[in-house]
Every structure is written in structure tokens, then in C-alpha cells.
């Protein structure tokens, strides 16, 4: 890249740096970018740069593949119902060990390596995420049946004061999706859904979902079929038609939830693309799929 092109890239970012100055951006960190060392580095660099140019990033991370590996090592078979992990007491201990004990610390360390002041938290920290047991239903033979997911929860409320205090002091909160109720019961939370709830609660400008796909596509195997922009009503129709299916549905539902709670836009991007977070935030064309209100 010659000097003129480098300068052009920097100049292109200027209006977006101004536009998002002091704004909160929630990043749901998941997928391949969590296990690939090179991807871990460029995601960390992206987030630290956001902080240094005046944005307020908040990370909430998943860890499904690593939880599955840990369960298999301990002789437990992962079980899912509608994309949610069935979580008995032993599974909950594994989830906490992996999310809080390993992944969260790894992310904090990586951000620190590149100059970021990161603080690792779980939803239990200062009652950051108050939760309740999730009631789940399935349709079986045209009958609605309640199923027990165990220690799976859903968000009741977010302690926004704690997040705001950290952001005011220029820290980057890194949050594990573990919730707690008033009786000190602990719950495993879907990270996508928790990210949407947090984004809405703290009045984030953007929610960025880091995934393993380029965005929402007609054909998952054909990147040219990507939708650059969608609205809430459009994604609803796409779910009904089966265009959006499987594990993408909870992500889209989390996106819609965030938008309905006041987030301006949600972006589904591919974490396998180098510096995809910066490309989304600081370029005119952006990257991935953007979803907005109608």
C-alpha cells in the first residue's frame, strides 16, 4: 500500500470517528475468531483502537465450541433444544469454568497486550446481569409442551451503572454471559441474546455480532447472495420463509430485540475477515449485513 492510499484510508475513517465519538458499541465476540490466534489478535487490536479514538466498546463473549470440548473431555454429551444448551448442575460448572475461568481472562490479556485497559466480568459481578429461569416450549404433535432446560436463564435487568462507571474511566468491559437471581442462583445465558439486552440497556449506538459467516445470505455457500441492509420486518419474513434458519435465528432475534430497545443499527460480520470490526465502523461501505428498524 503506497503512502497516498494509506492516507486515503485514514481520511475515510475521520467522519465515522467524529460520528461515533463517545458512543457505546457492544461487540458480541464469538465463532472462529475466538479460537484462531491471528484472528484473536486483529479483533483485540480493533477493539483497542476503537477505545483510543474515543468510542466506548463493550464486549460480551460466547464460548460454545470450547464448552463442548470441555464437556466431551469429562464424558458429557452436549444437548441443545432450539439452539439453547440444556444445562444441568455439572454442565453449569463446566460452562462457568470455561467462560469465566479461561475465555474471559484470555480476552482481557489479549486486549492488555495491545494497550487496552480491560476488565473481566461475569453477569454475577455486582449483579451485572440479573436473570431468571427461562421457560422454553416446543411444539410436538401440534401440542405446545414445556421443556426443562435446567440452569438456562434469560435476562431480567442489566446493572448499567457498573458498565457506565467502567466506561467513564476508559476501561473496556469484557462480560461472560452468566446471570444471577435474587436468591443467588446462577444461570447460563445465550450470549447473543444477552448482548442484545446489554446493548439496549446501555443505549448503545451499534451492536456488532462477530460470527463465522459474511452476513445474512440467500445461499450460505454463495457470498454474492449477501444482504447488505435489512429491516426488522424483512428478517421476520425471511425466518418465516426458511431463508434464515438454524443457529442464525437466535442471533437475528437478539438483533431485533436490541433494535426495539433503541439501538440504532445491528451488524452481522465475519470474524474470519481481518479487521472486520474496523471495516464495519470506519468505512463508508461497511461490511456484513446491517439490520435497522423499519
Swiss-Prot record:
| A GO CC term assigned to this protein in UniProt | cytoplasm
Q: Where does the entry annotate site (Transition state stabilizer)? A: 28, 251
What is the E.C. number?
A: 2.7.2.8
Q: Which GO terms describe its biological process?
A: arginine biosynthetic process via ornithine; L-arginine biosynthetic process
Please list the disulfide bridges.
none
Main localisation, per the record? cytoplasm
Localization: Cytoplasm
Assigned keywords, A-Z: Amino-acid biosynthesis, Arginine biosynthesis, ATP-binding, Cytoplasm, Kinase, Nucleotide-binding, Transferase
Tell me the InterPro entries matching this sequence.
AceGlu_kinase-like_sf, AcgluKinase_fam, ArgB, Asp/Glu/Uridylate_kinase, NAGK-C
UniProt lists the family membership as follows: Belongs to the acetylglutamate kinase family. ArgB subfamily.
Protein name (Swiss-Prot/TrEMBL): Acetylglutamate kinase
Q: Which organism is it from?
A: Methanococcus aeolicus (strain ATCC BAA-1280 / DSM 17508 / OCM 812 / Nankai-3)
